[in-house]
Amino acid sequence: MKDVTIIGGGPSGLYASFYAGLRDMSVRLIDVQSELGGKMRIYPEKIIWDIGGIAPKPCHEILKDTIKQGLYFKPEVHLNERVVDIRKKSERHFEVETEAGEIYTSKAVIIAIGAGIINPKQLDVKGVERYQLTNLHYVVQSYRRFKDKDVLISGGGNTALDWAHDIAKIAKSVTVVYRKEDVSGHEAMKTLVTDLNVKLCPKTRIKYLVGNDDETHISEVVLEHVESGDTHAVKFDDVIISHGFDRCNTLLSETSSKLDMHDDCRVKGFGNTTTSIPGIYACGDIVYHDAKSHLIASAFSDGANAANLAKTYIQPDANAEGYVSSHHEVFKEANKTIVNKHLY
């Protein structure tokens, strides 16, 4: 039996993993995705400004460090596993069951599943799956791949406009199509992309995709006006789909441990990450309380709070907080290496 099972491998879950290790707890970390990082993997090239004391840098750099930190104390990690139930058998005895039927036991549970299981909405046209490993994209991993390319973006929200704005600086051309009369993204961003000569095509959708000779790459896109039905084919090097996300939070609605909920998607909790069930803590975007802010920085704070409370739940006579890291014995040898690197 582990001390704590953390469900969710985003920033809050990863920091909870680190801090629980700092508090000398054994940790199990479970995530439904094939990689750790949560929603941060959706926008790897975005520049993150709002983490205190961290200089602005691309999200993928912050994510790399966050994962490294979360794994510092060598938690037991399970990827590609969807949790379907949390059962409180008794005080300090929980069972976490996965879709595959695996049952993991621990003394406490931390729920850090963000907005739930997030998957980009797929383009609904015939044969789309054959292009997903080549030049059809649902997530922009690197802007550099679009250098000097003709790029089509389908979607009129903030994410689509953000991608259009950044890609237009290096691409040969960027075209944005969306079904409505106007984009739903911020008006200021619409002005910015227009200034970069991004072509905006309202009331337009992708009718179907035309592949190359071996059907491995998209060579043309047939666009359709949603009102007139008129179509025309345009050659593009890459196609990006930004139609929003499908979210799944069935764990919270179907779990045996009936937590008080704020709405269908979020746990009703408190600033210290406690929930209506002792021994279960919620941190990051999944928890709601009056003082909640949805920032990566606050996700880190939530993770530390959840780990501290799990520690005192498991061991009531434990200190409410851990030692500050600069004085912690566990980092003594690592600190020597860091000091030598920076001073000599």
UniProtKB/Swiss-Prot annotation:
It holds the Pfam family Pyr_redox_2. HAMAP family: FENR2. This is Ferredoxin--NADP reductase. It catalyses: 2 reduced [2Fe-2S]-[ferredoxin] + NADP(+) + H(+) = 2 oxidized [2Fe-2S]-[ferredoxin] + NADPH. Belongs to the ferredoxin--NADP reductase type 2 family. Keywords: FAD, Flavoprotein, NADP, Oxidoreductase. Homodimer. InterPro entries: FAD/NAD-bd_sf, FAD/NAD-binding_dom, Fd--NADP_Rdtase_type_2, Ferredoxin-NADP_redctase_2. Binds 1 FAD per subunit. Coiled coil: none annotated. It is an enzyme of class 1 (oxidoreductase). It comes from the Bacteria. Its EC number is 1.18.1.2. GO terms for molecular function: ferredoxin-NADP+ reductase activity; flavin adenine dinucleotide binding; NADP binding.
